Amino acid sequence: MAKNREPIAKHCKALGISPAVMGYNHDNSRSWSGKVTNRNAQAQTRRKKSEYATQLQEKQKVKFIYGVLEKQFLGYYEKAVRMPGKAGDNLLIQLERRLDNVVFRLGFDATRREARQLVNHGHFTVNGRKVNIPSYQVKPGMVIAIKESSRSIERFKANLEANAYHVIPKWLDFDANNMVGKVVAVPAREDIDLPVEEHLIVELYSK
């Protein structure tokens, strides 16, 4: 049965992001115009909004992309502030290192939402041990694989075939034949291809 992706498209449109960021193809959403908001358009819109509204929307955008609720998101921010470097960069890097996001980035599933379900259902191992916590933070050297008893599930084969041309971030390595991924480095901000202005989130929480 086809999935109803209209709510996703509407939410994306409201936040000014393309459904492709969420892993959805434009063709799957009739309510998406196909136009990606550029920075000039964003700047014009920002002038029409209050500073608070603009900052709040940016936070909502990141929460929506990664599927994180407010309490957990605040926890990531508080930790980001304590870490060396830019708080905004640290915030995104923590979110990027979530196991469900890594499963998505490796192409095991087309969306973060579906990848989170797969992790919750215990289909993945990290360094040979089953991990069913979507927020689990991966580190360099860790190996992420489909659990042996889950490898025969047709969904995984279909997903990997559909995502054969999926671009793997340079901080990850993937062996499609063996269905195994490896974290080779901590992601840098420039490795995170998301249309977000994280400094606005820092400004929001700094008030």
Locate each region found by the language model.
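Ferredoxin-like alpha/beta domains used as RNA- or RNAP-binding modules
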Residues: 1-106, 133-207
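Beta-rich strand-turn-strand
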Residues: 109-112
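Short, well-ordered loop/turn sites that connect or cap secondary structure elements
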Residues: 118-119, 138
